[in-house]
């Protein structure tokens, strides 16, 4: 049976089951602990800001039953402001096409879909800011790489069915 989870940082609690808008979860950390199944939906409250939070999902929907991350309610899109959190390690195993492209090291992503398939992420605002330094390049070797969304296919072969809309 498909489940819908609600997340509202203002009225929620991570001790709630999150299965109704009246008893939502409070944080994305609680969402990261969920075991999402095909057809499940996670809805973030519009107008909410998830500061220093991130989504790291290792889940698979099905072609006819994707897992969906979206918004509910009225107001502006919910904002995930990772602010350098959401760390994961990348290693492509070899240098890439440009010396400025970091191929090994830690990355911060507001949303990480790791070995995921048939997942839709839509109607969210994603930020992952860093204080800018004049003259500093985006991909300096000593600077943490930050992304809004990262999709990684590593241990399960080619992944498909990833949909990103209105981000």
Describe these PLM feature segments:
Residues 7-45, 51:
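Acidic Gly/Asp/Thr-rich repetitive segments characteristic of extracellular carbohydrate-active
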Residues 3, 40, 53, 65-67, ...:
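The right-handed parallel beta-helix/beta-solenoid scaffold, focusing on the short coil/turn
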Residues 29-35, 50-61, 79-82:
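Short, T/G/N/S-enriched strand-turn elements that build extracellular solenoid repeat scaffolds
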Residues 51-53, 106, 119, 128-130, ...:
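Surface-exposed loop/turn segments connecting beta-strands in extracellular beta-rich domains
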Residues 137-154:
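Asp-box/WD-like beta-propeller blade repeats and closely related beta-sheet repeat scaffolds
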Residues 60-142:
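Right-handed parallel beta-helix/beta-spiral solenoid domain characteristic of secreted/periplasmic
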């Amino acid at each position: 049976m498909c489940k819908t989870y609600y997340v509202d940082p203002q009225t929620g609690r991570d001790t709630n089951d999150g299965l109704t808008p009246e008893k939502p979860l409070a944080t994305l950390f609680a969402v990261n602990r969920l075991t999402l199944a095909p057809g499940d939906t996670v809805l973030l409250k519009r107008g909410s800001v998830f500061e220093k939070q991130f989504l790291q999902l290792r889940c698979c929907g099905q072609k006819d039953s994707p897992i969906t991350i979206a918004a509910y309610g009225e107001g502006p899109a919910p904002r995930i402001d990772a602010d350098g959190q959401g760390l994961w390690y990348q290693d492509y195993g070899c240098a890439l096409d440009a010396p400025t492209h970091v191929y090994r090291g830690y990355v911060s992503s507001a949303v990480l879909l790791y070995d995921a398939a048939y997942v839709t992420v839509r109607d969210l605002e994603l930020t992952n800011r860093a204080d800018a330094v004049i003259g500093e390049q985006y991909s300096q070797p000593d600077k943490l790489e930050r992304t809004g969304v990262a999709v990684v296919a590593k241990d399960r072969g080619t992944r498909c069915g990833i949909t990103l809309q209105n981000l």
